[in-house]
Amino acid sequence: MIIFNLSSYNPGPFILVGIPGLEQFHVWIGIPFCIIYIVAVVGNCILLYLIVVEHSLHEPMFFFLSMLAMTDLILSTAGVPKALSIFWLGAREITFPGCLTQMFFLHYNFVLDSAILMAMAFDHYVAICSPLRYTTILTPKTIIKSAMGISFRSFCIILPDVFLLTCLPFCRTRIIPHTYCEHIGVAQLACADISINFWYGFCVPIMTVISDVILIAVSYAHILCAVFGLPSQDACQKALGTCGSHVCVILMFYTPAFFSILAHRFGHNVSRTFHIMFANLYIVIPPALNPMVYGVKTKQIRDKVILLFSKGTG
């Protein structure tokens, strides 16, 4: 049944359809989503625990890594539990405030993730290009200011999205063909001009993320120049190994993100079912893989994980 809203600026609940075209498979689709979500939660919680309790991990790089783990937890938790309730319980309704809250945390943590990866790139740049000045440049005070700065920047970028939606009148169907609320998807249900919503909601966050990518690329260009200028091959391999996990996480974050964004904007031949499925995988797979990547590629974390589980079985 099509649900219409006649209350203009005070809309009733929205209906989240799930994954269009695959409704009959929702119960089965929920199983791998649940497993991957549990892996993401457990992996990031272990990572946070190790960074907090192990004094040897109280370094700038691991501080930013703990921020990444926290944002990954929030990102996946903002979307996956509601998706599972749709898949398994048929709980499709979401209130307008609940929709805005979910949208804010999903978009906020996406932009914050990008900023954290940029900060981690700068950390690697200082560690490799100016190792003797590392502790004087990245002081605890500087790290805290950087963390607060990127968090506040992300907040300021995403908060207008919420405000713009609250200014729209809704007098059309309130059915959203998705498993979670996202800015443009909700704005398209309004019976008013959404040009501002489109240009701000699409262009500003994307330009912000692109600027982060450019700064990351510049940092790694300097890093590569410094690495290939090292006198010994062992030192070169060690320096590249230090950056390996970060590069893997960068590729896992930005590659599907830009693919999803471009497919949504220009991929008119991409089916809605594929796009929604891909968007759901994006909020759960990178958060699940990031702890594994750092656990495998970062010796300090790998050793602490082995020690933790050896104590548990001993």
Curated annotation (Swiss-Prot):
GO terms for molecular function: G protein-coupled receptor activity; olfactory receptor activity. Residues 54-59, 123-149, 219-242, 297-314 are cytoplasmic. Its main location: membrane. It is found in: Membrane. Residues 1-32, 81-101, 171-197, 264-275 are extracellular. Disulfide bonds join 99-181. InterPro entries: GPCR_Rhodpsn (IPR000276), GPCR_Rhodpsn_7TM (IPR017452), Olfact_rcpt (IPR000725), OR51/52/56-like (IPR050402). It comes from the Eukaryota. PROSITE patterns: G_PROTEIN_RECEP_F1_2. Gene3D superfamilies: Rhodopsin 7-helix transmembrane proteins (1.20.1070.10). Glycans are attached at residues 5, 269. It is a multi-pass membrane protein. SUPFAM superfamilies: Family A G protein-coupled receptor-like. Keywords: Disulfide bond, G-protein coupled receptor, Glycoprotein, Membrane, Olfaction, Receptor, Sensory transduction, Transducer, Transmembrane, Transmembrane helix. GO terms for cellular component: plasma membrane. Pfam families: 7tm_4 (PF13853). PANTHER family: OLFACTORY RECEPTOR 52H1, OLFACTORY RECEPTOR 56B1-RELATED. Odorant receptor. This is Olfactory receptor 52H1. It comes from Homo sapiens (Human). The gene is OR52H1.
